[in-house]
Amino acid sequence: MKNIICFFTFFFLFGSLRSEAGQLIEYNLQGAMTQDDIIYILWIAGIDPQADYGVSIYDIKYETEGEGGYLDTLGGLVIFPHSLTEAFPILSYQHGTAVNDASAPSLTGLSLDNQEVLLISLITSPMGFITLFPDYEGFGDPEKFHPYITAESYSHAIVNMVRAVKELSYELQLDDPFQFNDQLHLLGYSEGGYATLAAQRGIELNYNDEFTITTSCPMAGPYDLGGTMVDYFLSIPSYPKPFYVPFVLTSHLWYYQGEDVDFSLYFKPFWADTLPSLFDGTHYGNEIDALMPENPLDILLPEALDDFTNNEDHFFRVSLGENTLLDWTPQSPTYFFHGMGDDIVPYENAQVTYDTFVANGAPNISLTLFSEELGGHAEVAPTCLSAGYNVILDYQAISPKGDLNSDGLITIEDVNALMESILIENDLTEFQWWAGDLDADNSHSIFDLLGVSDAVAN
């Protein structure tokens, strides 16, 4: 295994050194696969074996915004296709709920220990996507907690991983080159569905001058956390995956009140003592479920449950409300998918969110609900993921040299864009500089313009 550790620093005033959010800290080559390797694995898995490209697999570490304004180091996995002459869309895939740190994508890589990552990777990257798997804040790090279902943490993790992968492209240009274009796709299911919509919200509200989202496909996420999800838990006598509830509640307590928060103010004595160790990253969800009561709210003190039920200003009501994702209007193409038989995350989350966005004037939004006959949360996941991926394929553009506008074609529009670059030195993205530099001399010149013009003529 080839291990490469890179420390990238920037000089500021007075000669000081400083990192910044999105900076690539470390990268490690986990391996590579040929087209034949991928086709064989997909065939064994019973999946239609298609692979247009071989791929490389790297885990990375990068900086993101952390608590108190300090930087935090996160991990992730990136798989990219092999081509010296094409630029590919970035597809950020947000994984579903996991509790044990050993399940982080950067740690499992492409292995049977993480079949979600393995299958999504081998379906997407060999077909021309640079596929990213953010670990998420705190996940995979035994020294930290993962702030489960907190919107801002996902937004930061995903934005900064995209930045870091773009830096990785620069760092690998001699050893293992790959090139991104200007397309960015978001896709995720369950926790990943929530993370997808949270990242879309964060990008559109705070980073729209840096990123344009091509498509966003949130699936089966608890977007209406303070409404649909609260009503659901207060109305049901039991819940199939009870560990989800304390995972949210402990995460919100630690995230907003600090890791020294007094759990005995909220939970019955046994749970106040036990929950911190259950969510220390060494246990699996099924282990925690085996300890939980059928009704997960039974872990709360009676007075805390009563206050939560009747007081809109209760801490949990406020934190859940702050992380409800209905307070904006998506501008990017947004495609919701959910199963009507979902027994973990009710489909009303998607319905309420869709209705709210439509009422607010969202220009390009869709909701697909799948029949109860397709099963519950886990059973309907492959159907949702397949539908979302097919939407993304419809938008996908793989860009040859000369395709400055990322539409997968070389047209007169690309000629005009390159001419403007040469004549007036207008601002271009990193991809557009690559696309316009046909003779690879690190500049845009009349020779590049002639090359693009010839491509249009032919």
Identify the role of each PLM range.
Residues 80-87, 164-187, 206-211:
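Gly/Ser-rich "nucleophile elbow"/oxyanion-hole loop immediately N-terminal to the catalytic nucleophile
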Residues 67-75, 79-126:
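Short, surface-exposed "cap/lid" segments of acyl-processing enzymes
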Residues 148-172:
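Alpha/beta-hydrolase active-site loop
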Residues 219-327:
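Accessory cap/linker subdomain of secreted extracellular hydrolases
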Residues 398-458:
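Cellulosome-associated attachment modules in secreted, modular CAZymes
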Residues 335-342:
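Short beta-strand/loop motif that positions the catalytic acidic residue
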Residues 343-349:
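Conserved alpha/beta-hydrolase "acid-adjacent" motif
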Residues 19-86:
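Catalytic-loop region of hydrolases
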